[in-house]
């Protein structure tokens, strides 16, 4: 009997040791490997979490073209059990399923915000004009009646982006940004610059990018719209306010292409406004009689 108990204890210890070796604790997050995918979850602030996934063993180190923020010092509580690895800051709780790779996001009170779907990450290898790469797909689970906004300047006439299939690729009159904002008080930025298919249906919401070496997204919790936008600005940097004259010079495809034309347009506009204002006055300037608008 004692021999059986000893064997059972040994197997239990080996199981716990094996489980302990399946993840790597970081100062503000965790690394683990699930279902052939390396998963890294890191807090960039108490309310911003980055999820970074690559095929197992990949050494790809991505440098974002959009995200400027470096992780700030954040106190993160760490716990685990047989099923989940749990991370908790002052604002967020994150659970990583050690069997399926699914990730659940909660607010500080334990309310479910978003679910990264179990087995929801897919890497499909392909030859990108001689360069090995992947089609990258990531799926999420939203509440049935949850409203989401965003995805840029879409010409669909809809504000709520639920139950839609949109091809995110920039062109004239269609500015695409792979970012959603939920009425539950969080935002999600999918950090991939290739043409991407956004799909939302009763089963799931997903981003399916044509080219990528990783699945990389940022979860931003702000409790309301102002808080989410503040989080986005913290993550990507403050948006500069350019002078009015630049709007037609370089911010549009149908722009003024020659700097001299820009100067002529500006001068004509100034003169036109001057004449328009002076036309309301009685009299003349020099020999020019002002009558009507130009």
Please provide the spans of the model-predicted regions.
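Bacterial Sec-dependent N-terminal signal peptides
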Residues: 1-24
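Catalytic and substrate-binding clefts that recognize carbohydrates or anionic sugar/phosphate headgroups
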Residues: 80-244, 253-255, 259-261, 266-271
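Structural preference for beta-strand elements that scaffold enzyme active sites
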Residues: 246-248, 278
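Short, surface-exposed charged micro-motifs
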Residues: 22, 38-40, 77, 93-95, ...
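Aromatic- and carboxylate-enriched substrate-binding clefts and catalytic-loop regions
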Residues: 115, 275-294
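Short N-terminal segments immediately surrounding and downstream of signal-peptide cleavage
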Residues: 21-35
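A low-complexity, Ser/Thr/Gly/Pro-enriched, surface-exposed linker/loop concept
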Residues: 23, 27, 42-85, 124-126
């Amino acid at each position: 009997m004692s021999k059986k108990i000893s064997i059972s204890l040994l197997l239990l210890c080996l199981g716990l040791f094996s489980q302990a070796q399946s993840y790597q604790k970081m100062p503000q997050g965790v690394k683990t490997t699930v279902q052939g995918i390396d998963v890294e979850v890191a807090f960039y602030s108490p309310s911003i979490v980055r999820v970074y996934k690559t095929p197992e063993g990949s050494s790809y180190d991505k440098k974002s073209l959009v995200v400027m923020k470096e992780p700030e010092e954040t106190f993160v509580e760490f716990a685990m059990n047989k099923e989940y690895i749990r991370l908790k800051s002052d604002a967020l709780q994150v659970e990583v399923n050690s069997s399926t790779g699914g990730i659940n996001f909660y607010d500080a009170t334990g309310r479910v915000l978003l679910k990264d779907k179990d087995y929801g990450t897919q890497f499909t290898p392909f030859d990108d004009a001689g360069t090995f790469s992947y089609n990258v797909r990531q799926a999420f689970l939203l509440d049935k009646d949850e409203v989401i906004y965003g995805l840029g300047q879409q010409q669909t006439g809809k504000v709520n982006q639920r139950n839609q299939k949109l091809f995110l690729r920039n062109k004239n009159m269609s500015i695409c940004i792979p970012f959603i904002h939920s009425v539950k008080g969080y935002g999600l930025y999918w950090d991939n610059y290739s043409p991407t298919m956004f799909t939302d249906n009763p089963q799931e919401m997903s981003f399916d990018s044509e080219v990528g070496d990783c699945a990389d997204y940022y979860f931003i919790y702000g409790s309301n719209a102002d808080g989410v936008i503040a989080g986005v600005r913290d993550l990507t940097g403050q948006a500069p306010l350019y002078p009015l004259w630049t709007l037609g010079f370089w911010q549009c495809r149908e722009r003024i292409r020659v700097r001299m034309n820009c100067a002529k347009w500006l001068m004509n506009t100034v003169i036109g406004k001057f004449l328009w204002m002076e036309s309301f006055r009685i009299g003349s300037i020099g020999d020019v009689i002002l009558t009507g608008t130009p």
